[in-house]
């Protein structure tokens, strides 16, 4: 028996339909280039209301593309496929002309962990969105690897505390992500 109120069920069902439609559109658009652009070295994932399965009728797509190989492979066709799928599914235009769809390296989500630039370059937000509220569109194996590496990065000091290591850096990042700025 489902105990969710009707409005939440509607949002969840709408989101699942949109996720499947986006996946189909992306696969079709990429066609023969899928293995080259995605394979097991890249992924496309969504966050925001789609990642939380709570899309409203006016919700937009918050998609990210990440590569592991750092090969310099031109990912513009992958980014264009995301834009095309967004339009084909009938979602609102991407925020900021789709700047978040721009492909980033997996290492960029890890290299700044704990540094002052983590916030200023928006990496903390990308990392927290990935861990807390993301769903994969394409590249399941790369997505799983990415999430695993991000989580593992928060346990990098566990060998220094063999009895009862607590991931305080992760807890701190979650707090920083959710903190409301102190406006004066």
What are these regions (language model features)?
Residues 23-74:
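Active-site nucleotide-donor binding segment shared across nucleotidyl transfer reactions
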Residues 1-7:
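Long, non-coiled-coil amphipathic alpha-helical linker/lever segments
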Residues 65, 177-184:
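Extended alpha-helical coiled-coil/bundle linker/stalk regions that scaffold oligomerization
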Residues 3, 45-48, 136, 161:
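Generic detector of intrinsically disordered, low-complexity, polar/charged segments
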């Amino acid at each position: 028996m489902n105990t969710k109120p009707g409005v939440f069920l509607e949002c969840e069902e709408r989101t699942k339909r949109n996720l499947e439609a986006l996946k189909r559109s992306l696969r079709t658009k990429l066609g023969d280039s899928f293995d080259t652009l995605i394979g097991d070295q890249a992924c496309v994932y969504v966050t925001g209301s789609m990642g939380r399965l709570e899309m409203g009728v006016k919700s937009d797509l918050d998609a990210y593309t990440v590569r592991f190989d750092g090969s310099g492979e031109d990912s513009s066709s992958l980014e264009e496929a995301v834009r095309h799928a967004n339009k084909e599914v009938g979602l609102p235009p991407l925020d900021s002309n789709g700047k978040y769809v721009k492909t980033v390296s997996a290492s960029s989500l890890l290299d700044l962990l704990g540094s002052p630039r983590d916030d200023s370059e928006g990496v903390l937000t990308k990392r927290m969105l990935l861990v807390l509220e993301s769903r994969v569109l394409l590249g399941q194996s790369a997505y799983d690897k990415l999430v695993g590496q991000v989580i593992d990065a928060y346990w990098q000091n566990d060998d220094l505390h063999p009895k009862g290591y607590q991931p305080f850096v992760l807890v701190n990042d979650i707090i920083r992500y959710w903190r409301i700025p102190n406006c004066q």
